[in-house]
Regions:
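C-terminal coupling/interaction segments
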Residues: 269-327
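A generic structural signal for secondary-structure junctions
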Residues: 80, 97, 106, 145, ...
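ABC transporter nucleotide-binding domains
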Residues: 3-7, 12-209, 214-215
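Solvent-exposed alpha-helical segments within well-ordered globular domains of core cellular machineries
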Residues: 117, 176, 220, 224, ...
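A short linear hydrophobic-aromatic micro-motif
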Residues: 125, 252-255, 286-291
Length: 327
């Protein structure tokens, strides 16, 4: 399988900040590569270099076999880019936006019109085709922006936070559309703040932190590498006592969220739940619920970076959040 996106030992500095410090990854043709990391980790810088909007200080970057520095025009002719903020003209209709993008991409006027009709139908925007985009909902704007990015049928698509701000129904529809593009043979590089999105869509995942790749693999491989189980204890009261008990079982930090839920990674041992219940009871902790489950991608991300999925950040109570290293 040929490699469509390739970054090799990329380095980039902005002033005193080392944005990238030897980042390497690759995406085979017809696959989805998820690039994850905390804010400021280097995700966007990597995408800017690969899409020719920034130059690396050193390292190599190739898209579709073309060097992004030496052959910018060739790279730009085979990629589509969907940014976090939709790049649409709100005073034009959906149809006009697509026709304009088609002509800018080198299609004839007639070809651009035919392509616009096809995309409006495929992305379920036909009924709104002749309305000004400023009146579109967030989900409609996202779908139109995605349609605009593939108007010239690029084999490679870069998506930067494509579903940020969308409701669950609109996000699910976008996922379906992206899956359709991959089935058609397109290669996708996806940055996202939603770990469930990467879990659903990505064939392979790269985790970047402080400008370096700290983990890579399939979602299943990353979960297995985390090891053990994830313990969640919902307590009615006695958070401090519960923290001490959970820490004695944990293999890493104990995370406490709003609603008095304690979470930690634990080793998968026989009789774990029974011993935990016994010790919590002995400590006088009133427990509402105890959960044990295999690690999710959010658990992997937390184990690697110490940060939770930002889409669930509102669940954290700033007065209750703390970590305590396991005894």
């Amino acid at each position: 399988m040929s490699v469509m996106i390739e970054a090799g030992a990329l380095r980039k500095r902005y002033g005193d900040t080392q944005a990238l410090d030897g980042v390497s990854f690759a995406a085979p043709a017809g696959t989805v590569l998820g690039v994850l990391g905390p804010n400021g980790a280097g995700k966007s810088t990597s995408v800017k270099i690969l899409t020719t909007f920034a130059d690396a200080d050193s390292g190599t970057a190739r898209v579709g076999g073309h060097d992004v520095h030496a052959d910018r025009h060739a790279v730009r002719s085979i990629i589509g880019v969907t940014a976090q903020d939709a790049t649409l003209d709100g005073l034009l209709t959906g149809r006009q936006n697509l026709e304009m993008m088609g002509e800018l991409s080198g299609l004839s006027r007639a070809e651009a019109r035919r392509r616009a009709v096809d995309l409006l139908e495929r992305f379920e925007l036909t009924d709104a085709a002749d309305r000004m985009v400023k009146g579109y909902s967030g989900g409609m704007r996202r779908r139109l922006d995605l349609a605009a990015s593939i108007v010239n049928r690029p084999p490679v698509l870069f998506l930067d936070e494509p579903t940020t701000g969308l409701d669950p129904t609109s996000r699910a529809r976008m996922w379906d559309l992206l899956r359709e593009l991959v089935r058609d043979g397109m290669t996708l590089l996806l940055t996202t703040q939603y770990l469930d999105e990467a879990d659903q869509l990505a064939d392979n995942i790269v985790v970047i932190d402080h400008g370096r790749v700290i983990a890579e693999g399939t979602p299943a491989e990353l979960k297995r590498a985390t090891g053990g189980l994830v313990l969640r204890v919902h307590v009615r009261d006695g958070v401090d006592a519960a923290r001490s008990v959970v820490a004695s079982f944990a293999t890493g930090p104990v995370d406490v969220t709003v609603g008095r839920v304690l979470q930690a990674s634990v080793a998968a041992e026989p009789g774990l739940a029974t011993r935990l219940v016994r010790e919590l009871d002995a400590a006088g902790v009133a427990v509402d619920d105890i959960e044990l489950h295999r690690p999710s991608l959010d658990d992997v991300f937390f184990a690697l970076t110490g940060e939770r999925d930002s889409s669930t950040a509102d669940d954290l109570d700033p007065e209750l959040v703390y970590t305590e290293e396991a005894r």
